[in-house]
Amino acid sequence: DIVYGGGRITATIPTPGIHMVMHSLCAAAVGLTLGIEPELIKQGIESYAPVEGRMQIIKTQRLTLLDDSFNANPTSMAAAINIACRASGRTVLILGDMLELGEKGAEYHRNMGKKAVECGADIMIGKGPLMKNACEETERAGIETMHFDTSEDIMRALDNCLRDGDTVLVKASHGTNLKDVAEYIKANF
């Protein structure tokens, strides 16, 4: 519910994440300030649909894929990990490098490994030199961990890794090409 001076808007946000609640509240505040009818604000919030590769929730025959492969930064990756860990089934994280982070890149990636441990991920699959830092954290904590240099190697490993009922997050900067992995999962699981 969005409560404002003149009333209440009850709307359901069709995508997960506290950050989406914040975005919806901001949009509603702007709309109300501009005099947009509350019913139109409700319709706008409830008709939201993510674009390809931006936290698309895809139910395949065997599992749930969270395709967030288009881009990544430390804040968006932490939010995506939280969403994945709250879903049903085993949590499988397929995370690629977050690019253009400068001197703190290794630290930011280590923090993603710690986040995966904190939220109780079951499997961590990393891609890229920076994501090795996250994989070291998850492996140290006893989480089943794999690291690969190519998307093709990840795809080969998935056949022996994924199970019915899993929730699989695919998240990375666009330049790591994890979109190919998301497409493989859609087509084969």
Region roles according to the model:
Residues 6, 10, 16-189:
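ATP-dependent carboxylate-amine ligase
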Residues 2-4:
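Internal nucleotide-binding/catalytic subdomain
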